[in-house]
Amino acid sequence: MTLKFSVERLVDSEKESEEADVEEQNNLKKLEEDEEDDELCEKSGKNEPLSQTLSYFDVLLPHVQMACSNPFISGIGASGSGDQNLNTGAGGSVWQHPWLELLQSTTAAQFGDVTAGLFLQPLRKNKRIRTAFSASQLIQLEKAFEGNHYVVGNERKQLAAKLSLTETQVKVWFQNRRTKHKRVRLEGSDPNAPMSNDEDDEDDKKSVS
């Protein structure tokens, strides 16, 4: 009985020892694999180029270069006033952001101050081109206005074609003429006085504003 118990205990201890050895070998193997993975990661990290991701500057620069090649912007840097505008503003400099400073310094050699002007110039509404009506056109428009203060639809289309004008030009002229008619009537002047090109230009500015 005692011998049997001793043999079983010896066998069990040998199994436990073998299992411990196997587990230790597995742990050692896993540790070696982890070390190899760490070395590979370090090597790949050293060899990997830094410019894998695009910064905001990288994305913005091509658009700036394309805009600078626009012939309509080429006169900005040569006007002479651009340099003065670039150095004004709060704190003595308008280039308060680091990326703007980087953009300016990088592109200044190639594009001058044109690049800076792209960021600093405020958005402006396109100025409406003044229509210079001829004397005969003004006479015909005044006659049409005497007959009807509101010319719309086919009547406006026919009048524009007759005077070699666009419908928009006729529409704006009638708007300005009605404005003058109301104004002179309030002032006690002659509301039927014809409107000159200068008066048309002034009323046009008021209607646009």
From Swiss-Prot:
One of its GO terms (molecular function) is RNA polymerase II cis-regulatory region sequence-specific DNA binding. Residues 1-14 have a biased composition (Basic and acidic residues). Its main location: nucleus. SUPFAM superfamilies: Homeodomain-like. Disruption phenotype: Mutants lacking the homeobox domain are viable and fertile but proliferate slightly more slowly than wild-type due to retarded larval development and reduced brood size. About 20% appear starved as they are shorter, thinner and paler at all stages with severely affected adults bearing only a few eggs. M3 neuron activity is decreased. InterPro entries: EMX-VAX-Noto_Homeobox_TFs, HD, HD_metazoa, Homeobox_CS, Homeodomain-like_sf, HTH_motif. It is found in: Nucleus. The keyword Phosphoprotein does not apply. One of its GO terms (cellular component) is nucleus. Residues 1-46, 181-209 are annotated as: Disordered. One of its GO terms (biological process) is central nervous system development. Residues 15-24 have a biased composition (Acidic residues). In the anterior pharynx, expressed in the I3 interneuron, the NSM and M3 motor neuron pairs, the three m2 muscle cells and the three e2 epithelial cells (at protein level). Residues 126-185 bind DNA. SMART domains: HOX. Keywords: DNA-binding, Homeobox, Nucleus. Belongs to the EMX homeobox family. Required for activity of the M3 pharyngeal motor neuron. Can substitute for ems in D.melanogaster ems mutants, partially rescuing the mutant phenotype. This is Homeobox protein ceh-2. The gene is ceh-2.
